[in-house]
């Protein structure tokens, strides 16, 4: 499912766009009569009879003027505004939710017999209805003020217009539209518990888009299974989707010309700008590379679709043979294990909505959506998933690893007995300072003393530009004077290499975290109590890597100096422990920006790190260092020049 906001200024125009009977814009289902003539195929209102009566709407079929009035924020009969003006003065608009069936469902709809077509349409309609009911029940779609505070609450119901479509757009190359079952559900208003008609709160809907889309697909898979179709789970991007088992993959690709066209446009963008398009840019590419709907007869479309199916041996009665077949069995881990793995692939914590979305995605074809939500509650009750303060969640497995890391680091921090000595520290500090043509500052000297102390686990905190490199260089020199082995590590190879450049005492002795742990585990690298490991940008280590590293350090008796900044880029996987470890172990903090001597520039750097971007931008603007362009692409181009 995708969600798009229709602004107040475009509300009426968008309504006319969906309601138009002309060839160019979309129209209803692009439905054609048997003889190929466009039909009315009106959209349907999704609202209770009482609400429709309040709005002066008779019957469930949408009449153009009624829809246009609601999208403009007006009562369909009186023309009076239904709600207050927003911050920009607008009163109309809405949210367009597009529920698009998997390509195999559209293929069976297009190529199957009349009964299969009806079954696909009915399953799709039921799934959309279930998803909308779930949205109304679980997503707060009303925003109001209490005692000066803005709060979100659930609506009694929403008012929406539903349009049924069965084809995608044609492509610029001239090909006709592919089969693509989808429905636009345009939410125009919400009804508060007190009965007042108000605007829809869009942000909660956008936050819940993945969950509602997953609920729709789960419901659709359940509907299809009830009708005798087998489901193949784990298809599409990140394995979040499903297809009907038995439909040739090559056919699905052949019936996806529009998707290929957008993908080619994205590749051209990547070639020009050296990066993938962001969400807004991708939406613009879709608009730039779309062709108006071309109304051709159903018979014409059927000939093209049948010819395409024949190339993949899926013509004739092949679609009807899908009924009753079984999907190829694939060895899989237990559902709960799969869910936990997906949830913590990229972060140690997650939103409750993401938890439900992942469970719905992973259980497609295995559980109904209601059963999946029951399982989500059971996983919380069994403490496999743990609610945290602030509304986030984590898994018991991740928390257990975090606790193991904290326990190990606390042990390292309390294990003393090896100190490089004040003489070695002073000599190393002088040599490192001489290399940069100056002296160590008071906070740098203190940091050097802390990280060369007797504890086996210590932390050095400091943002970029505070002179961490010279402190690490001095510390490594001091350790080497005592006959100790020194190694530098980082998550990425480039960071490890830069560590050796910024701290010459570690030159030729740096490697990635993964390489160090792997070599130690396989006996290819020996580390012991006479080894000190300097871990740069430690905040970028995910929990699994940190777990293996601290275990290796604990078992070998070596020393670990973790260096980083809690405000830097986070880990790629589940992580975020650096700040917590700094509370456990002896820590030194570098806060003075040494990259510039200008106090105003130093304050601007500190403001950026602390999230006070308005202050930093004001400073850069006052210095003429802030340059504005109309678009992101123009800004990138000017920066490159």
Regions found by a protein language model. Name each.
Residues 1-338, 343-344, 351-360:
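Intrinsically disordered, flexible peripheral segments
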Residues 460-470:
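Walker A/P-loop nucleotide-binding motif
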Residues 404, 413-416, 425-427, 431-433, ...:
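Conserved helicase motor core of P-loop NTPases
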Residues 357-426:
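Interdomain "pre-motor" coupling segment immediately N-terminal to P-loop NTPase/helicase cores
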Residues 471, 475:
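Hydrophobic positions on the alpha1 helix immediately C-terminal to the Walker A/P-loop
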Residues 478-555, 580-581, 591-596, 600-627:
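Conserved P-loop NTPase motor core of helicases/translocases
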Residues 458-461, 561:
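Short hydrophobic/aromatic beta-strand immediately N-terminal to the Walker A/P-loop
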Residues 488, 559-565, 589:
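Structural recognition of the conserved hydrophobic beta-strand(s) that form the central parallel beta-sheet
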């Amino acid at each position: 499912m995708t969600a798009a906001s229709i602004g107040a200024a475009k509300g009426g125009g968008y309504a006319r766009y969906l309601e138009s009977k002309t060839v160019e814009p979309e129209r209803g289902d692009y439905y054609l009569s048997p003889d190929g003539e466009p039909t009315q195929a009106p959209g349907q209102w999704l609202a209770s009879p009482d609400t429709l009566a309040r709005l002066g709407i008779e019957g469930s079929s949408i009449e153009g003027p009624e829809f246009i009035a609601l999208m403009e924020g007006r009562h369909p009969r009186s023309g009076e505004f239904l709600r207050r003006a927003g911050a920009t003065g607008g009163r109309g608009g809405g949210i367009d939710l597009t529920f698009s069936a998997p390509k195999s469902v559209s293929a069976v709809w297009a190529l199957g017999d009349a009964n299969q077509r009806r079954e696909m349409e009915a399953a799709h309609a039921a799934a959309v209805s279930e998803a909308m009911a779930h949205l109304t029940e679980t997503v707060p779609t009303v925003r109001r003020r209490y005692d000066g505070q803005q709060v979100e609450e659930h609506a009694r119901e929403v008012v929406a217009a539903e349009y049924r479509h069965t084809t995608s757009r044609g492509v610029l190359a001239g090909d006709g539209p592919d089969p693509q079952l989808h429905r636009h559900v345009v939410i125009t208003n919400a009804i508060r518990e007190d009965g007042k008609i108000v605007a829809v709160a869009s942000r909660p809907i956008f936050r819940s888009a993945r969950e509602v889309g997953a609920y729709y697909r789960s419901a659709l898979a359940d509907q299809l299974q009830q009708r005798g179709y087998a489901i193949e789970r784990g298809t599409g991007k990140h394995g979040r989707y499903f297809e009907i088992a038995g439909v040739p993959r090559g056919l699905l690709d052949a019936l996806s010309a529009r998707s290929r066209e957008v993908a080619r446009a994205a590749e051209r963008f990547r070639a020009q700008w050296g990066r993938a398009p962001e969400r807004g840019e991708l939406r613009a590419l879709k608009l730039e590379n779309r062709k108006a709907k071309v109304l051709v007869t159903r018979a014409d479309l059927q000939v093209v679709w049948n010819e395409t199916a024949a190339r993949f041996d899926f013509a004739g009665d092949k679609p009807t043979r899908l009924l009753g077949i079984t999907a190829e069995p694939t060895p899989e881990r237990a559902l709960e294990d799969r869910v936990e793995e997906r949830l913590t692939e990229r972060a140690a914590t997650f939103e409750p909505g993401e938890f439900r979305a992942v469970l719905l995605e992973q259980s497609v074809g295995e559980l109904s959506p209601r059963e999946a939500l029951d399982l989500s509650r059971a996983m919380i009750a069994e403490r496999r998933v743990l609610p945290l303060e602030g509304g986030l969640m984590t898994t018991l497995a991740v928390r257990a690893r975090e606790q193991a890391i904290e326990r190990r680091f606390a042990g390292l921090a309390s294990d003393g007995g090896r100190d490089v000595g004040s003489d070695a520290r002073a000599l190393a500090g002088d040599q490192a300072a001489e290399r940069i043509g100056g002296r160590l500052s008071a906070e740098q000297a203190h940091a050097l003393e802390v990280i060369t102390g007797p504890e086996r686990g210590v932390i050095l905190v400091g943002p970029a530009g505070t002179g961490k490199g010279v402190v690490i260089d001095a510390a490594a020199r001091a350790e080497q004077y005592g006959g100790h082995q020194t190694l530098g590590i980082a998550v990425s190879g480039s960071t490890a290499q830069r560590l050796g450049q910024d701290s010459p005492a570690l030159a030729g002795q740096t490697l990635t975290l993964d390489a160090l742990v792997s070599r130690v585990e396989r006996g290819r690298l020996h580390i012991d109590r006479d080894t000190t490991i300097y871990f740069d940008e430690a905040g970028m280590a995910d929990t699994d890597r940190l777990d293996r590293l601290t275990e290796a350090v604990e078992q070998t008796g070596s020393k670990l100096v973790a260096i980083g900044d809690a405000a830097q880029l986070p880990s790629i996987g589940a992580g975020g422990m650096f700040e917590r470890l700094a509370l456990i172990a002896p820590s030194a903090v570098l806060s003075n920006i040494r990259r510039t001597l200008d106090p105003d520039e130093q304050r601007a750097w500190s403001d950026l790190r602390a999230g006070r971007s308005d202050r930093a931008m004001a400073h850069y603007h006052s210095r003429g260092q802030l340059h504005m362009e109309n678009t992101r692409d123009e800004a990138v181009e000017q920066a490159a020049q």
